[in-house]
Amino acid sequence: MPYLSLLLLFFFFSCSTNNPLRNVEEYKGPIIEIKDLNTLYSDSAQAKFKLKSEIYQVFESGEEKYPKGLNMDIFSTDNDSVSASFKANYVIKYEKENYFLATGNVVLFNYNTGDELRTEELFWYPNEEKFTSEKFVTIKTGNELHTGEGMVSNQDFSNYEILKPSGIIEVDEN
């Protein structure tokens, strides 16, 4: 008789709908995390970009994040010298759409011209080889300071346009 009551008790508790595995939350963190990333991208044996980041994360969705910032050197298309540099406090790459969104103290600098862009948000489209922003931008060129809303630039920041310029622009009358 005691075995029968134990057996009934076992069946009673084993039929419970309270499954502890059902309460486990799905993991949404990175599936890959690399510390002190230093990567060189090349195409047809020609250097394109050099990326440096304290932390690099890849998620199941394909998104890539640089939560502690990203520094990138952009190589010239005609030789292996660095023509521009880019840095930001936080960067995320949207894999499906193939663009990067950089936020927080974004700086884009061209070594050949000395021009420097500063903004709080910048989009990079590597397939189109261009940068864009819809936010307020400041561009320092020599002794001039250009400001405005929105900007479009080629990848090495040698050719750019401020979409809604503002401020004072010095004009040479000669």
Locations of the language-model features?
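Mature-chain termini and adjacent capping regions
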Residues: 1-174
